[in-house]
């Protein structure tokens, strides 16, 4: 039978052997009167619930905003592993609501479930914050604590997700349905507010505050943990005025039992003598009431359309992983503000708040006036296409970033520059092979070659002979180099003559957008340089070369330095994103001690503003896909199945994150190619979904109404009764 066709339930020819009588639910105790807000019809208890939700969402999204960078730079995992664990955590957060709903519906009730799992949530934050302390153990300890903390957080946030909104709805009397609807609007506003504010603030706590000489991940995790403590305390404060309905049974479990019984009963009755039934779910008629079977039939028709949906979430949820990793390799200076890479995620909730009224009141109405039938399924398909375009744009940005990156020497190649620290010009040539024409220009005093020159090696390592001409002197020197490296040949005065030294340079930009610096000291005394309150380095006398140090991007007009008998400061100027600098400390007789600044590797030039189009496209896709998808699903399934639909919707998000995990671990593609892969996969899925939607026959509301059935169990369930609100989950 075509799964898209309407399924009218008919009496079967096979007489049921037995029918299980489902006892009616005992009447609920009357709700005790609750204090109201300023004499209105709004219970005072909802204020505690709304504040709780704001703090909890701040806690979750704030912690998650910095998570990918924590994996990369604190736990020192590679990008693929960091992405995989990030999406494994996200997936777990969307699997655990099923467990939370089952606990609330069948055992503890909503209130106790929220309290107990919030305690688990807080414990997870505490363990996660401890794991981010550099002084607490080594790499293994940090990793173990982090994974335990994240597992508890996933259990806590997922477990309470299906309970909090529904518990708020329980505070209203049935006659105050209008006030309850407005409450849900405020509730969902608190979700978006918590997401928006936390995604902006916690990256600043991480990047703008230093702990133990590093980014302060402990603070970035600790503040969201504190907000979760506040959420728990505020929620518990309202305990005495809450209406706490008892557990009412789990409709999700009932659906699974009905489906399982139908399948098993069908296989038990495979004989050709037994009459066939119109629908495979009709085989549950021996045990389950007719209305429940009709509702499950309607549910399965919608769930069939859910099969392609995880691919969309696979793209959408990469904003916090792959797109953040892309942002760290871009120039984040906007002129009026310097962004942290993980702050770009704030665009999503911000644009959601802008796009929802724009689409509802402008775009959809204009399309309707043009006479175009823009159905829900078509909106979802367009949302998928917009997400495809977003990843195509992300791939183009990635390609441009790679083009701006410094070229790398290949096998049997090195890159070489010459720095002349002598008091007069020097001419340098390479002796004895095809490279002798590369360095033909004289290099003036305190100048360098305009760019790195490529030298070809005969083997993986080679000794090069250099001919130096200085005044009337002609000198020969020899230096050894290794393939695939960058070098600086430093010419310096040596009495009345000159000498040279070969210094190995950094090969590439830092992966985290930090600035790399090192120093050459031409003074006759050691110099101690304080780059920050907790970062200093010593440079040996007489052309000593320091190790590389990474520092935050910014202006450094007065870096404190000292020798054994003198304190002084150096103006290093702007140290920009991703650049590598060499500073030569010299004593100029006219201007005193100075630092000659040499940019070995240029800064990131690609502005982070180029990520705005991909964020705008994917958020527009989210508004068209997610909001419309929920509205469509709820219009096509009976009211008794709303909580089951929400469970299935959350599962599609969980599966989408698993797809990213698998691709990140096993694709082996460069980043721009991976973006193209996701874009193409979703395009194929969009085509399949469009075909499914073309043959889908929408169900009218009256078609889902069946005759009253005394065997229908009165089960409402405690999953969130999602209204068609525009929000994050």
From Swiss-Prot:
Annotated stretches, region: Extracellular domain (ECD): 402-611
Catalyzed reactions per annotation: a dipeptide(out) + 2 H(+)(out) = a dipeptide(in) + 2 H(+)(in); N-acetyl-D-muramoyl-L-alanyl-D-isoglutamine(out) + 3 H(+)(out) = N-acetyl-D-muramoyl-L-alanyl-D-isoglutamine(in) + 3 H(+)(in); glycyl-L-leucine(out) + 2 H(+)(out) = glycyl-L-leucine(in) + 2 H(+)(in); glycyl-L-lysine(out) + 2 H(+)(out) = glycyl-L-lysine(in) + 2 H(+)(in)
Ranges of biased composition (kind: Pro residues): 24-33
Tissue specificity annotation: Expressed in kidney. Not detected in intestine. Highly expressed in macrophages.
Stored CDD domains: MFS_SLC15A1_2_like
Keyword Membrane: yes
Modified residues (Phosphoserine): 9, 28
GO term, biological process aspect, one: dipeptide transport
Membrane-protein topology: Multi-pass membrane protein
Coiled-coil ranges from the UniProt annotation: none
Compartments, as annotated in UniProt: Apical cell membrane; Cytoplasmic vesicle, Phagosome membrane; Cell membrane
GO CC, alphabetical: apical plasma membrane; extracellular exosome; phagocytic vesicle membrane; plasma membrane
Keywords assigned: Cell membrane, Cytoplasmic vesicle, Glycoprotein, Immunity, Innate immunity, Membrane, Peptide transport, Phosphoprotein, Protein transport, Symport, Transmembrane, Transmembrane helix, Transport
Bilayer-spanning residue ranges: 58-78, 84-104, 114-134, 140-160, 184-204, 218-238, 296-316, 344-364, 381-401, 612-632, 644-664, 675-695
Modification Phosphothreonine, positions: 12
Pfam families registered for this protein in UniProt: PTR2
Region forming the signal peptide: none
Segments of this protein annotated with the region Disordered: 1-34
Family as reported in the entry's similarity comment: Belongs to the major facilitator superfamily. Proton-dependent oligopeptide transporter (POT/PTR) (TC 2.A.17) family.
Function: Proton-coupled amino-acid transporter that transports oligopeptides of 2 to 4 amino acids with a preference for dipeptides. Transports neutral and anionic dipeptides with a proton to peptide stoichiometry of 2:1 or 3:1. In kidney, involved in the absorption of circulating di- and tripeptides from the glomerular filtrate. Can also transport beta-lactam antibiotics, such as the aminocephalosporin cefadroxil, and other antiviral and anticancer drugs. Transports the dipeptide-like aminopeptidase inhibitor bestatin. Also able to transport carnosine.
Subunit note: Interacts (via extracellular domain region) with trypsin.
Protein name listed in UniProt: Solute carrier family 15 member 2
Source organism (scientific name): Homo sapiens (Human)
Gene expressing this chain: SLC15A2
């Amino acid at each position: 039978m075509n799964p898209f066709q309407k399924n009218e339930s008919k009496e079967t020819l096979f007489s049921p052997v037995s029918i299980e009588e489902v006892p009616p639910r005992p009447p609920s105790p009357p709700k005790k009167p609750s204090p109201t807000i300023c004499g209105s019809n709004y219970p005072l208890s909802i204020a505690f619930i709304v504040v709780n939700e704001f703090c909890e969402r701040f806690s979750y999204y704030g912690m998650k905003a910095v998570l990918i960078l924590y994996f990369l730079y604190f736990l020192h995992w590679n990008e693929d592993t960091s992405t995989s664990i990030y999406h494994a955590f996200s997936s777990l957060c969307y699997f655990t609501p099923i467990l939370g709903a089952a606990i609330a519906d069948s055992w503890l009730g909503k209130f106790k479930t929220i309290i107990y799992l919030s305690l688990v949530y807080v414990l997870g934050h505490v363990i996660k914050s401890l794991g981010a302390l550099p002084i607490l153990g080594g790499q293994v300890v940090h990793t173990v604590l982090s994974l335990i903390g994240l597992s508890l957080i996933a259990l806590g946030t997922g477990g309470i997700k299906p309970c909090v909104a529904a518990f708020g709805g329980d505070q209203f009397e049935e006659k105050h349905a209008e006030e309850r609807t407005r409450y849900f609007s405020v509730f969902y506003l608190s979700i978006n507010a918590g997401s928006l504010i936390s995604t902006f603030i916690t990256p600043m706590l991480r990047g703008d505050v230093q702990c133990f000489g590093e980014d302060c991940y402990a603070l970035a995790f600790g503040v969201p943990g504190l907000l979760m403590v506040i959420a728990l305390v505020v929620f518990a404060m309202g305990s005495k005025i809450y209406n706490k309905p008892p557990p009412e049974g789990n409709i999700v479990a009932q659906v699974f039992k009905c489906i399982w019984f139908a399948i098993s009963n069908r296989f038990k009755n495979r004989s050709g003598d037994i009459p066939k039934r119109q629908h495979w779910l009709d085989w549950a008629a021996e045990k389950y009431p007719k209305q429940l079977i009709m509702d499950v039939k309607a549910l399965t028709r919608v769930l069939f359309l859910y099969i392609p949906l995880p691919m969309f979430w696979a793209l959408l949820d990469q904003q916090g992983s792959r797109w953040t990793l892309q942002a760290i390799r871009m120039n984040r200076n906007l002129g009026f503000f310097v962004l942290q890479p993980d702050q770009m995620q704030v665009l999503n909730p911000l644009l959601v708040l802008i796009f929802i009224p724009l689409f509802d009141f402008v775009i959809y109405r204009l399309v309707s006036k043009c006479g175009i039938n823009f159905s829900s399924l078509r909106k979802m398909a367009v949302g998928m296409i917009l997400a495809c375009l977003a990843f195509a744009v992300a791939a183009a940005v990635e390609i441009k970033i790679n083009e701006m990156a410094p070229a790398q020497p290949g096998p049997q190649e090195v890159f070489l520059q010459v720095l002349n620290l002598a008091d007069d010009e020097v001419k340098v040539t390479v002796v004895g092979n095809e490279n002798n024409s590369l360095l033909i220009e004289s290099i003036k005093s305190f100048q360098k070659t305009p760019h790195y020159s490529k030298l070809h090696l005969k083997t993986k390592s080679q000794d090069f002979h250099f001919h130096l001409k200085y005044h009337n002197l002609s000198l020969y020197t020899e230096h050894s180099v290794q393939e695939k490296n960058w070098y600086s040949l430093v010419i310096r005065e040596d009495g009345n003559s000159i000498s040279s030294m070969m210094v190995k340079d950094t090969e590439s930009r830092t992966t985290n957008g930090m600035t790399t610096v090192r120093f050459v000291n031409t003074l006759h005394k050691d110099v101690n340089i304080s780059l920050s309150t907790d970062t200093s380095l010593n440079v040996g006398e007489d052309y000593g070369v320091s190790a590389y140090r990474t520092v935050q991007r910014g202006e450094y007009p007065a870096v404190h330095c000292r020798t054994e008998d003198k304190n002084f400061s150096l103006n290093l100027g702007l140290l920009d994103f991703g650049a590598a600098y060499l500073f030569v400390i010299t004593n100029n007789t006219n201007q005193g001690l100075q630092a000659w600044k040499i940019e070995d590797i240029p800064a990131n030039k690609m502005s982070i503003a180029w990520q705005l189009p991909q964020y705008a496209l994917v958020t527009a896709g989210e508004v068209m896909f997610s909001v419309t998808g929920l509205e469509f699903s709820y219009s096509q399934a009976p009211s008794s199945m709303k909580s089951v639909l929400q469970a299935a919707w959350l599962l599609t998000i969980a599966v989408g994150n698993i797809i990213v995990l698998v691709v990140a671990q096993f694709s082996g593609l460069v980043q721009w190619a991976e973006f193209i892969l996701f874009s193409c996969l979703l395009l194929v899925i969009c085509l399949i979904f469009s075909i499914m939607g073309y043959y889908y026959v929408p169900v009218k509301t009256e078609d889902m109404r069946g005759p009253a059935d005394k065997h229908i169990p009165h089960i409402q369930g405690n999953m969130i009764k999602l209204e068609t609100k525009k929000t994050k989950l």
